[in-house]
């Protein structure tokens, strides 16, 4: 959230010298923690998912999928693009920055429904019976799954659209949470 809510907004207002200094000295350090924080979260998430065993249901399956996409966005899109932006590697910073922004905003978008999936896994309306019990062909699971996949594709090659602002991405995350888990619960 730091990059979306704090650093990005600061860079919009910063003097050129201050922005250049932060890009050179602060951003690489913050990106290191961001990247390895994503790795730790991913690995602990897999471990906790494995520990749930028979406690897995549609909610946590969708939340886990979004968590996996968030991890992949950090390591395969955001980090490589940001290395170019901050000058660690050669490349077109003007082309790399929008890629990082789209993936980063997609991660914020997925944060709300992913968190809801974690809560819903124990407090949702579905019985738990492990991955074998998830009705992957159920329309109430399939539509949210396809929506998540479409949003991830948009995060890779699309446009930020209403997620261009911090306020917009927060509102979109709340809306996505309501839509996904409304579909899971009522279809």
Sequence positions of predicted segments:
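Polytopic transmembrane helical bundles with strong interfacial aromatic enrichment
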Residues: 1-187
